[in-house]
UniProtKB/Swiss-Prot annotation:
Protein name: Small ribosomal subunit protein uS4
Disulfide bonds: none
Gene: rpsD
Function noted in UniProt: One of the primary rRNA binding proteins, it binds directly to 16S rRNA where it nucleates assembly of the body of the 30S subunit. With S5 and S12 plays an important role in translational accuracy.
Known partners and oligomeric status: Part of the 30S ribosomal subunit. Contacts protein S5. The interaction surface between S4 and S5 is involved in control of translational fidelity.
Residue runs in coiled coils: none
Amino acid sequence: MSRYTGPSWKQSRRLGLSLTGTGKELARRNYVPGQHGPNNRSKLSEYGLQLAEKQKLRFSYGLGEKQFRNLFVQATKIKEGTLGFNFMVLLERRLDNVVYRLGLATTRRQARQFVNHGHILVDGKRVDIPSYRVDPGQVISVREKSMKVPAILEAVEATLGRPAFVSFDAEKLEGALTRLPERDEINPEINEALVVEFYNKML
């Protein structure tokens, strides 16, 4: 299954989750798109609930199904902690996500583009792989030639707050994942147990 690249507002309404992080998609119409609007919510089966929760989490990070599933498999190999939370931490440690959390991009999709285009450095070296796994303490910065890119500067200015598990210097346009996040600091709207149940049946 390929990565979804269609209208994020329509997809957000379908999932009942803001994919842009602004919540504007759901402000006026918090029901699935289509002719029947609010009356179009049908009761889901157990499998349907698990699938819907998996899709919510996958679309939140903007990943294709294969990449998302492979990361889940990696999480199953971590011996400490719970599988669902370990999976979410691996998602959070992706470079594109850390760039987004630092406020260098307004969305994860935009953050992925910045990484792909070579705007981002990790410990002073250019990394253009969005899935690169960031370790706590590694310095994420903007390449010198990219420091005046309008979209980056606008994102930094528009960012009102950052998670407690990252640090950021707006003057230097650099920051770091200072520690791994706690469960209550990420995706409170997601029930990761349903995602685990879904893949336990599939793998």
